Amino acid sequence: MSGRARLGVAREALGAWLLGGLCFWALGGLCGLGATAPGAGAGGAPGTPRPCQAPQQWEGRQVLYRQSSGRNSRALLSYDGLNQRVRVLDERKALIPCKRLFEYILLYKDGVMFQIEQATKQCSKITLTEPWDPLDIPQNATFEDQYSIGGPQEQITVQEWSDRKSARSYETWIGIYTVKDCYPVQETFTKNYSVILSTRFFDIQLGIKDPSVFIPPSTCQAAQPERMSEDCSW
């Protein structure tokens, strides 16, 4: 699946975005998915659902679970597919001792990512080594199911897609998107039958309210080349 990597370089904490994007999506190795599975995606039988087109510009929130840490992390997200850039802002939901909060600005046209500590504005500038790949459903994805989330009078219909192919009976990526408007709901990555990364998206609003969020602060003019640690081990 050409380019299922969303933003693959910075730190595991962004998982679905930093390891889960552009050509890697978190160790799952979803690049080069290959031919469409029979009955799925572009090669499906008449009446088989086809991948919808996800919004190109939106803002929302995400909760990311990483198996490696056993933790959930929350962040605000600004996604600009038209200009190939993403901004992720860590959210603090509880007092966690020795936890540093960061802002990440990923500019794929420039091939760089800025990591900015929220408290001090200290900045790191890191080269992005993977090409841009949009957050959407690949055209050769396999349709798995359609169902409703919620209950009577309060439900939304979603479709579930995967990278499963006829040559194997399991998948390493599962994406859930709404039928109406094709909003991302959840993306999950597995390895050796275990979930290694799962991201939930919510509170999505179309458009970018303030495009300046993609402009690094002035402190990034003297950015260091090394990634900063999330904990207090400076």
Residue ranges and their predicted role:
Residues 2-17, 21-49, 128, 134, ...:
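Non-transmembrane domains of secretory- and envelope-associated proteins
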Residues 74-140, 189-198, 203:
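An acidic-aromatic
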